[in-house]
């Protein structure tokens, strides 16, 4: 039995998580939120089928703290134990993420957090940007020691369209030994937030972060996954370094595009809020950005460019909002999504994503998969004859789902979230694991420093730390590919295998039967961030019995960390 604690119950949690709990009949045992919200939460839960759900509150004075107070943490843990909580989902304002991640991991709980992983106040300051990066690595250390799992809700990890794209890219990169050479990512969510909206707490700007840390994080995550695909290539095609040049469009910039007088003119037939009468020329000093634009380059060890990328992430795009009175900021304030991805593998392959909405979720009809529909998502493949005689292929996302899956669904992105939640609650796979976010965090960190540079009137390129002890150590798909393809013509049958993730490398122990030559082979396989991939301590046996004994010995060695000799061998390889 899975018993869930939900931390934070705002518009996003209500639409996504509570819908999922009702649909899948999941036990929501506990909601945690601020004391000021207690009555509203109780009313909402009672009216929506969660009368048995308990509520735990903490004082509003702690909402911006980095750590839960000791007494609050102790009381919350006691409640979680009483209710036998097995999984914890964090859906608070991101400033509170760290305290609950710390609480969950220290107490060996399975935890899922919304993106971004953490933020701090005053995110235009270098101190806060450094703090967010530092917090990520602190969470990693906690996750290493914890018996619980830790995942980040980036639902495109389970989006069938993007899964297909990653599969095709991986196949072409590996087969033709050609890297992804260009990635262009555009996303607009048409969030027209007007001057009187900018003090909001939900997806705020006033703490110094905007689009990049709002929905932008999904595309940082996506970009990092694309870059990792190139890592199967070695030699001069191996990416070891990167940098980014950033520009942003700020709320103050927007006031020069759309002034207070413009608002009065556009909405002259509506009741204008007092804000516009009292603030003729408002300023938003060091508020978060409306739009983020980044030019990224990734280099080999000689300093030559392997991959270029562009990020165009905007709030300041076409919207359906035609009213000045504020509605729900999450999905009912005129937001519409435009998403476009363009990926090149040199002259061999071009993949494009086109996903364009023209209406709000509340205007859903039965026909939503055409251009302009809520579920429009098409993938185009343009092929060089060297890789595919068919010059063009097209996939409609809806064709990848059954009619049964489409019943009672909120959208394809939401189906992806459902798959994520299913796998999180059942510990099925490692997608979205906190340990796989290091490259995304390093890219985010450098992009955020670029925003700081603009606010500080500095014009400079920021380095991206592409390789450290974490950024490439947990790429499950690539590791699986490596092991599956390892001398496939000779190793058709794996009898046993064991995988151990270390800080800077991954160890496998394999017991395989080489059918064509009628012997068993047992070895340790190594994949590490120093570009080493090799087999160690290999032995061959005619006897299955002795092969298995040797396999168990190697399994014991790596499982019990008796690995000093192996580490020396790894060092000698590098």
What are these regions (language model features)?
Residues 156-260, 427, 454:
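Predominantly a Rossmann-like dinucleotide-binding segment in NAD(P)-dependent oxidoreductases
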Residues 327-484:
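C-terminal helical cap and adjacent loop that interface with cofactors, partners, or active-site loops
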Residues 207-360:
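Glycine-rich, aromatic-lined ligand/substrate-binding cores of catalytic
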Residues 1-107, 121-137, 479, 483-487, ...:
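N-terminal glycine-/serine-/threonine-rich beta1-alpha1-beta2 phosphate-ribose binding loop
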Residues 479, 483-528:
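Short N-terminal "domain-start" leader segments
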Residues 108, 114-117:
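Short helix/strand-capping hinge loops at secondary-structure junctions
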Residues 531-548, 554:
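A short, exposed loop/beta-hairpin motif centered on an aromatic-Gly-Thr core
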Residues 129-155, 183:
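Rossmann-fold dehydrogenase core element
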């Amino acid at each position: 039995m899975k018993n869930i604690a939900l931390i934070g119950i705002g518009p996003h949690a209500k639409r996504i998580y509570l819908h999922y709990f009702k649909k899948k009949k999941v036990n929501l045992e506990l909601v945690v939120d601020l004391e000021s919200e207690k009555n509203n939460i109780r009313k909402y839960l009672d009216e929506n089928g969660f009368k048995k759900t308990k509520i735990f509150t903490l004082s509003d004075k702690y909402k911006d703290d980095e750590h839960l107070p000791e007494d609050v943490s102790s009381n919350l843990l006691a409640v979680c134990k009483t209710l036998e909580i097995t999984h914890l989902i964090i859906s608070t304002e991101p400033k509170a993420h760290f305290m609950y991640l710390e609480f969950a991991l220290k107490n060996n709980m399975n935890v899922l957090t919304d993106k971004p992983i953490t933020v701090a106040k005053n995110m235009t300051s270098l101190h806060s940007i450094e703090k967010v990066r530092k917090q990520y690595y602190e969470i990693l250390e906690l996750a290493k020691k914890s018996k619980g799992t830790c995942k980040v809700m980036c639902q495109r990890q389970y989006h069938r369209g993007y899964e297909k794209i990653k599969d095709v890219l991986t196949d072409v990169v590996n087969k033709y030994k050609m890297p992804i050479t260009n990635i262009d990512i555009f996303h607009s969510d048409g969030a027209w937030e007007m001057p009187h909206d900018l003090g909001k707490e939900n997806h705020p700007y006033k703490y110094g972060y905007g689009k990049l840390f709002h929905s932008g994080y999904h595309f940082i995550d996506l970009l990092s996954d694309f870059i990792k695909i190139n890592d199967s290539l070695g030699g001069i095609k191996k990416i070891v370094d990167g940098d980014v040049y950033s520009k942003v469009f700020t709320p103050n910039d927007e006031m020069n595009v759309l002034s207070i007088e413009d608002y009065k003119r556009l909405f002259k037939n509506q009741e204008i809020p007092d804000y516009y009468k009292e603030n003729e020329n408002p300023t938003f000093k060091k508020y978060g950005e409306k739009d983020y634009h980044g030019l990224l380059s990734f280099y080999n060890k000689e300093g030559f460019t392997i991959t270029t990328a562009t990020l165009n992430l905007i709030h300041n795009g076409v919207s359906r909002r035609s009213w000045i009175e504020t509605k729900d900021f999450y999905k009912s304030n005129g937001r519409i999504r435009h998403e476009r991805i363009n990926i090149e593998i040199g002259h061999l392959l071009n993949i494009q994503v086109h996903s364009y909405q023209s209406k709000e979720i509340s205007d859903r009809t039965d026909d939503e998969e055409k251009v302009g529909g809520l579920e429009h998502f098409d993938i185009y493949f343009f092929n060089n004859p060297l890789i595919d005689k068919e010059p063009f292929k097209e996939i409609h996302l809806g064709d990848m789902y059954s009619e049964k899956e489409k019943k009672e669904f909120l959208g394809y992105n939401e189906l992806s979230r459902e798959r994520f939640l299913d796998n999180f609650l059942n510990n099925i796979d490692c997608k979205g694991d906190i340990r796989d976010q290091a490259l995304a965090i390093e890219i985010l960190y450098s992009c955020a420093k670029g925003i700081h540079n603009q606010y500080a009137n500095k014009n400079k390129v920021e380095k991206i730390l592409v390789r450290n002890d974490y950024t490439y150590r947990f790429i499950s798909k690539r590791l699986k590919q490596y092991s599956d393809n390892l001398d496939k013509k000779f190793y058709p049958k794996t009898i046993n295998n064991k995988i151990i993730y270390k800080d800077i490398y991954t160890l496998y122990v394999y017991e395989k039967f080489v059918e064509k030559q009628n012997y068993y082979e047992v070895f340790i396989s190594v994949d590490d961030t120093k570009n080493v991939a090799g087999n160690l301590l290999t032995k061959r046996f005619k006897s299955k019995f002795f092969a298995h004994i040797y396999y168990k010995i190697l399994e014991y060695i790596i499982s019990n960390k008796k690995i000093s000799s192996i580490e020396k061998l790894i060092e000698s390889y590098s």
